[in-house]
Every structure is written in structure tokens, then in C-alpha cells.
Swiss-Prot record:
Enzyme Commission code(s) on record: 4.2.1.96
Record flagged with keyword Acetylation: no
Protein name stated in the entry: Putative pterin-4-alpha-carbinolamine dehydratase
Source organism (scientific name): Parvibaculum lavamentivorans (strain DS-1 / DSM 13023 / NCIMB 13966)
Pfam families given in the database record: Pterin_4a
Length: 104
């Protein structure tokens, strides 16, 4: 189990995430990814799902055609943890590498 991020460690971790924003009323972060089409969006989700399963850390997400809305939080920690930052960083890397555009 990852512990909840607090204080300076939290500020530092979140400062490194571009395009992610705090979810109103929750200790969570969110981002919308936009892809060329459904196949690219679903392929991205599949790659992320395989890693998320190995991490035992699963995103909350919704997909409509080329759009993917993602919310990350760690339920066991009752808020944001290193697992969320790790998964967000990986998602940004993969989305950027494949030439995807991200948009909030």
C-alpha cells in the first residue's frame, strides 16, 4: 500500500505533472486525453490497463470515441499517493510518444 502524499512531497510530485488538475471535492487528479480516433484511444487504454493491473492500481476512466477522461486517486490511502503520480507520468509519456494530443 502506498501512503497518502502530503506537504512538500505532495507539492513536488504534483508540480511535475503537466495538464493534470485537482478534482473538486476529492483528493484526486484528472486529465482528458484526446486521440486521433477510437482505435488509438482504446489501444492506449489497453496498454495502461496492463501496467495498472501489475501495479494493482486502477484508474477511474471513461472513453467516448477519441476522448479519454481519467481520474486518479488511491482508495487505500484515502487520497493521492505515489502510485497516482507514477501512473499519471507513464500515461503522459505514452500519450506524448505516440504523438497524441492532450487537452483539459
Amino acid at each position: 500500500m502506498s501512503g497518502k502524499l502530503t506537504g512538500k512531497a505532495r507539492e513536488k510530485a504534483l508540480a511535475g505533472l503537466k495538464g493534470w488538475s485537482k478534482v473538486k471535492g476529492r483528493d484526486a487528479i484528472e486529465k482528458t486525453f484526446k486521440f486521433k480516433d477510437f482505435n488509438e484511444a482504446f489501444g492506449f487504454m489497453t496498454r495502461v490497463a496492463l501496467v495498472a493491473e501489475k501495479m494493482d492500481h486502477h484508474p477511474e476512466w471513461a472513453n467516448v470515441y477519441n476522448r479519454l477522461d481519467v481520474v486518479l486517486t488511491t482508495h487505500d490511502a484515502d487520497g493521492l499517493s505515489d502510485k497516482d503520480v507514477t501512473l499519471a507520468t507513464l500515461m503522459d509519456k505514452w500519450a506524448g510518444k505516440a504523438g497524441k494530443t492532450t487537452k483539459k
